Amino acid sequence: MNDLNLRVAALKVCAHPKRFAELRDALVPLPNTWIAAPHDFVLQFAAAKSSAEQVQVVKDVFYGEQAQDHEDVAHFLADLLLASPLKHAVRNQLTKLFSDNALAKQNASPHRRHSKEHLLEALQQSLGEMANSLAVITPPVSHERTNDVFVSANACLQNFPFGREALGKQVHRFAPLLTTALERYWADICDPTLELSPTRRNELYLYVQNALRFLVSLLAEWSDKLRLFEDQRFPGTSNAVAQKVARYYDTPWDVRSIAALLIGHLARFSGTFKAYVEDCSRPKAEQDVPIQMAALLVLRPVDYTENATLALAILKRIVAVSELKSTVTNLLVFLSKHLFIYSKSLGEMHAHLPDDQKLLYQRILAQLQVFALQNISSDTDSVRHMSSALLHQVLQHAQAAGQEELFQVVYRQFEDRAAYLNASCMALEQLVAVAGVSKSIENCPSLFGVIFPRHLGCEDCVDALFKAMMVSAHKTEPFAEWQSRWFGLLLAAIRVPEKRRQVIEELIAQAVQLEPTRLAQVLLPDDRLPLSCKLAAILGVRQLSARRQNLLRGMKEEVEQALIGLDDHTRLLALRFLVETPRPSELLNADQMGAIELYVRHNANNPSAHLRQLGYGLLQKALKRVHFGLVEYRKSRTPASQEVLQFLIRLIRTLAQNLFPTANYGRRWLSLRLLRDCLELSEMVGITFSELGIELPTEALMACLGDSYEHNKVLAAQLLERFQSHSLFKPDEMIELLLSLRPSDSATGAFQLQVYCKASRVQSEMPTPTHGGTIHEPLTFRALQWCLQHLREGLRLAQLDLGEAAKLNPLYGLLFASRHLLQQLKLKELAKEPQWRQYIDELVTMCLAVSSVVLPVVSSASPEGHLPETCDQETDQPLTNVLDRQLSREELLQVRTTPQMILLCAWRSSKEVCLILGELVQRAPLEEEEDEEQQQQQGDFLLSRAQLEAIGEHFLQLLAETKHRGAFEQAYVGFTMLCRRFWHSESVRLNQLPGQWVDEAMAMVSGQEEWAGKGARLCATRRSAGMPFMLQALVGTELKLGTHATLYRCMNRLLEVCERRTGGAAGITARSHALNIMRALFRSSELAELVTEFMARGIQCALDGLLLAEEWAERNSATLLLAALIVRVFGVERARLETGELHVRNRMTGRIFFTRYPQLFDYFHAALQRESEQMDAGGGGSENASGKRRQAVQLEAMLLMLSRLYPSSLEGAESTLNLSEFVPFLIRICHSHDLMTREMAALVVANFVTQEQALAEIRRIVVELKALQLRLKNTEAANTKLNTNVLHGQLLLLLHLHRLVRWTRPSLTRMQLHTLAELAAPLLQHDACAFSALVAVMVAAMEDAVEPGLLDFQLLEQIGVVYLLNHKEVQSRCQQLGISNRFYQIFGLHLHRLRGISQGIVLHIVEDLAETIWALDELKVELWLYILLQRSLSEQNSLVSEQDIEHFEFSRDIRRYFETLSREQREEVGQELYESPAVRSSVLHMMHMIKSSKNSCWSLQLAGRLAALQTLLRDPGLELNQLVQRCSEEHSTHQEAGLLLGLRRLIGESKMLERKHWLPMLNYAQRLVHPGQPVYLRHQAAELCDSLARNHLRDQLVAGTTDVDIGLVGRFSGLVLLLLHDDAEWVRHRAVQLVCGAGLRTRSGAGQEQEQSAMAPLILPSALIPPFLDTMIGKLTFDDFNMVQRLVDIIAEPFTTADAMELFDKQENNHYCERNHVLTELWDARGRADPRARTPTIPTGYQIFK
């Protein structure tokens, strides 16, 4: 009821929920009868400025003492209450005042107090006047006014006792009005002459529902009073209208249910209830279901004495309808909801039935159970939930009545597998909730015999059932039995690899929560359980937290192993286990601190941002515990606190070591933040660096200032500022960076300058004179003056020659440094000193001058190619990439000036100017905001009025004229800062400026004559360039004020410009600008939901622009706007599903869409109707080709939006805005002349129709196709011309509809195939395109024909005729239209499959596809390769994996064909292909043709597939020598996969690999692991290395080998290091498996030999590298140290070459590898192997800081 009233109230004003919220906060107008009243309380209410003030006035008027007119107060308040919108604050307050509680709170004198009788009289009078207002006006009052009166009066029944009582006295007035209103509503709905729009009809249905609901409420409350009413029209007329409403097919189900309830109440009211129930029990049509359902709902417990048999009969009819219409979702939603309501009323029925009718009660419950069990696993959420609740209610009634039979039904269904597993488990779960566990276990032995062992951890329904039964059993079973049965089953399931471990862990945690102490004793000692399971259980149970210290000691080795293990989930659980504790003040112990250090050491370089954030959060918890330890250390130096201090020291040193120059981003990110936290922690406690015994890692932090990520620069600068007193930076080096052409160098120089200015002592002084007059930040002032000096020099050069300035002094670095230093200062303090004020003045002047110099470049029509006249006009100077390396000044003079260099200088300088000016306006004291006296005395401001005007005009000019996107985007940022300051300014003049700019901008955009000159400056291309950004800044910054007036003003003006359709060039330009600006506003995240109410009009403008636009510019803008609106409505585009369908997050139900944008329903309805009528009329032959195309584009765009909608399960339940309304028009649009339109329309139809509608449409199409086939069979009609567009559209529609219904009606699908087979031959002669669509429909049906018996022999013979057509003719006709004949080959494949003869399938695949006509087709190669890959995958020691199959990207039709084959057919076909000589000869022949032919028809993809296919044959004809030779040759990347498969096969088959092949293959693998190669090839390189290491290189890689090939071992080790540092995680993990599985890691201690096995635990590469290097280096026992050094040099070669330095140090292709860290690990391993080894000399700048 409340939800309905909310919808009604929203409809009274508008349909948009946001506007409805505004309605509730808007002012309540005075009732009409009180507008001219002179009373004081009326005037007080009228003077209120907000809804809050109105509420206060109402309270004051009620509780205050009115000197006069006291009698009128209650009447006024009653009128005001009924006139207020529902849920409005004023109405809510008045409802509270008209109550006994409010009367008790009155403090006025007795004679001026309100009494209950007086208030009831006022309410009664107001209700009477409101009813009279509908009865006396002629002509009749509008439907809207009538509905408002009924809704307001009906609200008196909702939590309003006074209103209910007053309404009861006026019920005789409203009953006839309701009857009359229902007649009027229904007459308008049924009147075809009115031509109601869909939304208007929907409103009328809502009015009908409100009137019916009100009438039902009156009958339920005051039927006795209504019987005294003498007007006989009331029951009869109301019943007649209700009968029509309840049976009308177009009526929403909610309205039909209310009408049916009214029929039942009227039957009881009229004394015909018995006849009414008898009539409902008879067989009825489907449209009578609501009336039958209402008959059950209106039954009272006492009625069952006479009507129990009839009630059972009615229920059986309803359940029968639900079985018959099981695919009609909205019907099932209606029935499930109302049957559940009905079941709740059956509790008292049993007591009123005589003993001889008790059986009827059981049969009623059984019928309800039948419905519940049928729909308990429905795909519709509401049906599923309601059916579950219904079954629960039925079982409760059965338990209370002692009816065990209903429980046995559920048991039998579960045991007999009579329903799907999901349905059986959900039903049993409801039974367990009612009857407990013991009987379920007794009656369902398959629970523990089959279901739980097989499906637990794999099926959600089984998991939910197990959890419910386990929790319930814990309450009744002894612990030993419960543990053995339930917990033991979980422990067994967790060990099965196929189970979902996380689900089982959650169940185990749930079990441990039930018995924390005893289960922990069972769980923790079990070594067979994974550690993640134990940790999840411990962390989930608070009672075990106290024992965590003891648990850690017992699991120390396991936890440490988990911290460096490959499983991310286990690593985080282990870290949580270490750091989380119920008492944050609990100190870390030695084991925990050591484990945390281990985690930081090996997880700092994790490239995953998600895991990095989670790990950092947990480490912060550890630092909080460290803080408590340091506090204790300051108080009393206990051993535990001293240990914490030492841990902090070690942690700081580790973090400092992590900041080496080549550290990857993840390591720097985590280390800088933890280092900051640690240093702040020590500073907070008061522990100095000297006390810590460490020094700040100055060199490392200084190197971090050159980081490519600015937030890392910020952190490093903050640490240096805070903890470094002496700066080592030199001014000449900093200015060199600031003058660099590389923006990253400029940023580095600026941050160095920041640190330099904050230091208390500097090593080199600034080459500028000191200014003794400056008190605030003198060093920063000198630095800024220094930058300003160089800026002046650069500006002078730029004014003379911008090209030379772009090379020698590009300006933007100095501007960035100036802005960066100003950000560190408090500008209010600067305003107090004249020197600072003068500097700001000079800086603003300099910025404006720089902008004027670069403006011609960024405002050029082609900024990317703009080259102004320069002194350098030489054309023979060399081109140099000046951004790759720093050049000297002399070298730069010799570099040719290019447009790109000038553009870089121009737009980045413009960017910095805009940001400087914007930040100054936002933060600096302004002249206009200072007090006048203060200005005269001190003048403490930084920006004057004139400067503000100049800055404002500068931004407006940039945004209006700039063409370069980077420039106007940054101008937008600066202008946003300015607008934000002006909107919030206390200066009236400044506060008004943004509004004036909006008006001017709107005038320019709309093309007003007085602004025509300025409007010409706007950029008509580049999406209006900066103009949308200007409006976005002006609109977005106003939001902080809490008002949206500017947004509404702009949007309405822009929409009016588009809707006005002014002719001429000016109108086209204005609409283009308006569309582009609206696109920016709709995309703005700041405006969020504020623009939602304009989106419907925006969509209409965009679609109209596609149809009516005369120029490409307007059409382009309309297209971009529509794309932005689609993203705003349906969300950011996500990856499509494998079937090609849109992601569910990018779709929406039609109910939600048209509830948000109801006016679009009428728009789409009218547009589709117009298009369909034109289709029927012949397509509008009077239009030209251009007009047709524009019309098709608009229609395609509309269909694109509609294709994202799908029917709701509540379709037709509460609204008539149903998607099915569009289907008749869309079916006719499928006949469009445009191919894309036909395809989209067919897809949308299939999305919108139900299964029943789809079957009906298929029948219609099949009949029409049969008629066409008979017509074409006539020899005279064979030459008649067909409308191929219509035919093709029908076939497309048939295809999509078949995919919806599949083989649900086998007879219809057989008839469809028969008709299409008969039509194929004549259709090929007319149109190959239609023929391809026909065959596609047949293929779709044949694909789904998997079950035996669907197609008989006769039908297969008829279908086979299609494949007997002349193949050459098929190919020829397809080539004429540019159509691939692949569809015909797929058809042949399925035809032979359905014949069921495996030898025939093989014969077709091997021989038919090898015919000359198919020789150049790729299908057979793709099919052969896919079958052989699947065959190899099924073998025990498979040569291939799923990654190989994914790599070749097989098409869906091939994958679908293989899935339709039976298991036996797959095995037989695969074996035949594997052994077939014909396949082998065909493959070798095609490969020879590819090598010898230069024909372009041979694609690289085909060549790659052939190379892979050859390796999978029984006799591939490959020789290892040839493959090894190919490894050293250059060839296409597509062929690498086949080459690798061949190598791995021959290596695996060879018992011994010749030594000469070792190095070539390792070199080949090293080429494959280059970061520029695809991830698949890098993974295959790891597989190749694994094959070599396990089988052929093992003798060289094990310890104790005397004949060691240093080059071989070194190459292999370097290759493994590259794999361990690969950017792709799955490649790194495969390398870890290689090292651990091949026994290439050593661990100290006993059992070392056993560790060299495949059972070695898999750990992170960072933890695996040291033992791996120890194995590879330490096993050499040579006395000659040079041998070890040579091995180390070979291993290090991939990381020390110039190419490696360029590749890894930039971290462009590989973000994980840290070259310097690898070399350090290598040299450390050498030192461990030979202590005599000297420390190597590491290149300058690459040391690791220690």
From Swiss-Prot:
Biological process, per Gene Ontology: adaptive thermogenesis; negative regulation of endoplasmic reticulum calcium ion concentration; negative regulation of lipid storage; tRNA methylation; tRNA nucleoside ribose methylation
What tissue specificity is annotated for this entry? Detected in the larval fat body, salivary glands and wing imaginal disks (at protein level).
Q: Which residues form a coiled coil?
A: 1252-1286
Phenotype on disruption: Flies are hypersensitive to the cold, hyperphagic and display elevated triglyceride stores resulting in an increased resistance to starvation. Heat production is impaired and flies are slow to recover after cold treatment. The size of the lipid droplets in larval fat bodies are significantly increased and flies display increased feeding. Total body glycogen is also significantly increased in adult females but not in males. Mutants also display an increase in calcium-dependent SERCA activity. No effect on levels of circulating sugars, glucose and trehalose.
Question: Which range is the signal sequence, renumbered to this chain?
Answer: none
A GO MF annotation of the entry reads: calcium channel inhibitor activity
Chief location bin: endoplasmic reticulum
**SUPFAM superfamilies reported in the protein's UniProt record:** ARM repeat (SSF48371)
Q: What are the subcellular locations of this protein? A: Endoplasmic reticulum
Q: Pfam families, per this entry?
A: DUF2428, TPR_Trm732, TPR_Trm732_C
Keywords linked to the UniProt accession: Coiled coil, Endoplasmic reticulum, Phosphoprotein, tRNA processing
Q: Name one GO cellular component term.
A: cytoplasmic side of endoplasmic reticulum membrane
Concerning its family, UniProt says: Belongs to the THADA family.
Query: How is the subunit organization of this protein annotated in UniProt?
Result: Interacts with SERCA.
Role this protein plays? Together with methyltransferase Trm7-32, methylates the 2'-O-ribose of nucleotides at position 32 of the anticodon loop of substrate tRNAs. Plays a key role in energy homeostasis by regulating the balance between energy storage and heat production. Functions by negatively regulating Ca(2+) signaling pathways that are involved in heat production and maintaining correct lipid storage in the fat body. Regulates Ca(2+) signaling pathways by reducing the activity of the calcium-transporting ATPase SERCA possibly by promoting uncoupling of SERCA ATP hydrolysis from calcium pumping.
Protein name per UniProt: tRNA (32-2'-O)-methyltransferase regulator THADA
